[in-house]
Regions:
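Catalytic core of soluble alpha/beta enzymes
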Residues: 113-226
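N-terminal capping/lid subdomain adjacent to the active-site entrance of alpha/beta enzymes
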Residues: 1-140, 145-154, 158-162
């Protein structure tokens, strides 16, 4: 856990990088082109095989592979969804936020994430400003960086829902599986996001099994490698 996993990630991710360079192809392509069983043999199912077995994982992967283009080179021209936080940092004036939102809209951005958590009334004002600028055809997300308690999260989500938030990222302590469940039970119609601070697969198992995680934000260093 923690530092141990970060240290392991430095080693294992470097090996993956070497494998990629040896085969003269990007790592994503090397992984996609692996036979399903070869890929699964590189993974450990310890502590999670009570919710997903290697055979079940194989079926999922094989099903997903049917959606791949016949020519993987086509993926090089595919635009994958991404978001920008450039306009949403705390401390920005309304004028600066407006300018940055308009600038990023002109560059083609359609998904915007903003930081919240210092003052809920200011958060409401800022969300209203950004939503009006980007319209309802674009997506808005918020990240409170774990600052709220469970009860504060439940209350504040109730105040921010009017702005059609795609997901609420790390609204409370990222280790609090039961807390996320309480939030989800209070607001079953909203999406919760977390994962960049989760250190192991068992935590992910708990979040996913109790249906309190909608957007899984994996950090390939914190969990000891890809």
């Amino acid at each position: 856990k923690g530092v141990t996993h970060l240290a392991a990630a430095a080693f294992f991710n470097a090996i993956w990088d070497l494998i990629s360079k040896f085969h003269k192809k990007p790592l994503w392509r090397y992984i996609i082109e692996l036979k399903t069983r070869d890929l699964l043999d590189k993974l450990s199912f310890s502590y999670i095989d009570d919710v997903i077995t290697k055979d079940e994982a194989a079926k999922i992967i094989d099903q997903k592979k049917t959606n791949l283009p016949s020519n993987l080179d086509d993926l090089n021209s595919t635009i994958f969804p991404a978001y920008t936080t450039a306009a949403g940092w705390l401390g920005y004036s309304d004028e600066k936020m407006k300018g940055l939102v308009e600038e990023n809209l002109s560059k083609g951005w359609t998904h915007f994430k903003m930081k919240v958590g210092q003052d809920i009334e200011r958060d409401i004002h800022r969300c209203k400003l950004v939503r009006e600028l980007i319209g309802h055809e674009n997506k808005l997300m918020v990240d409170s960086n774990q600052i709220w308690s469970v009860n504060e999260t439940i209350e504040n989500i109730g105040k921010l829902k009017q702005f059609d938030i795609l997901f609420y990222e790390e609204p409370t302590n990222p280790d609090d599986v039961l807390g996320f469940k309480k939030i989800k039970d209070a607001h079953p119609d909203v999406n919760l996001a977390t994962g960049e601070m989760i250190q192991n697969k068992v935590m992910f198992k708990q979040f996913i099994e109790n249906k309190s995680l909608d957007y899984c934000q994996i950090d390939s260093c914190r969990i000891a490698s890809i």
